[in-house]
Every structure is written in structure tokens, then in C-alpha cells.
Amino acid sequence: STAGKEASGTGNMKFMINGAPTIGTLDGANVEIVEESGNENNFIFGLTAEEVHDLNVNGGYNPWEVMKNTEGLEKVMNSLIDGTFSSDIGMFQELYNSLIYGIDGNRPDEYYILKDFEGYREAHKRVDEAYRDKYGWAKKAWLNIANSGKFSSDRTILEYASEIWNINKIEIK
């Protein structure tokens, strides 16, 4: 998700608990995952929440220019409207338009998908390189597992009970 847009999710926590390094933006639970297991054991890319905020406040983002100036991105975008994915070439026209021109009064590419494209592609190259080092990959996996305790349901329930619900733990004998 775009940095600053996602409150949190649990899917990536489940992946972490099972040893998968995270590939994603520094947003939502990814922030906590990186804090626990380290940036070196995950693959973070894209704009920061501060950069997104600055673009939202100051403007200056032109998805058309990003598409034209990012190697391969125009080909990816054109594949949405040239019949690559469906003989109904209009099937993805609204998606294309939302990213390049904006629709329904919204600005174009409001989630900065095109802006993050190059970082996403580079992150995948880093994943591919890291995966070739089996020992290094196993170390990343183990460090993700070993540092995933923060996401335990027991810890979460205790924290919610005391900080949100204002109830005490009941000892069962």
C-alpha cells in the first residue's frame, strides 16, 4: 500500500511468522515488521509517508511524465489497453485512466503506484539476488520468525484488554 495510507494488516504478519521476508512499502504493519526483524531482512521500496505527504501538499507529481521516463513502464501501462490481457480492450481502460488522467474528480494515480514502480522492480531484483544465497535467505527467514513474537495473538489480546477495553486479566485455576 502507499506509505501513510494503510492502518495495518495481518497478512504480512502471518508471512513473517512463517519466515517470509516482507516486500513492501514502509507502511502499516511493515513498519513494525522492519523494526522487529531489521531492514536488512526485508525488502522495502517506494515513497515514505513523509514523501507522500509532501507530494500531496506541494503537488508536482505528473504520472504521465513518470510513465514516459521510467524504463518499461509505458509498455506495462499500454498492456492494460492494447488487448494483452483481454480481447475486450476497454476492460482495463478505467484503471489506465485513473492512473494517468484521474477519474471521477480524483487526481491521477492518487496512490503513487507509478511513482513506486521503479522501486518495486528494484526490490524484486534484490529479492532474486538474496534468494540465490541460500544461507543468507535462511538467515532472513529465521530472523523473521525469531522476531515475530510481537505479533502473537496472546500479546495483542493482553494489550487490547489493558489499553483499549480497560479490563484485567483473569487467572483461571
Predicted regions: what they are:
Residues 1-141, 145-150, 155, 159-173:
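Catalytic binding pocket for nucleotide-activated donors in carbohydrate/polymer assembly enzymes
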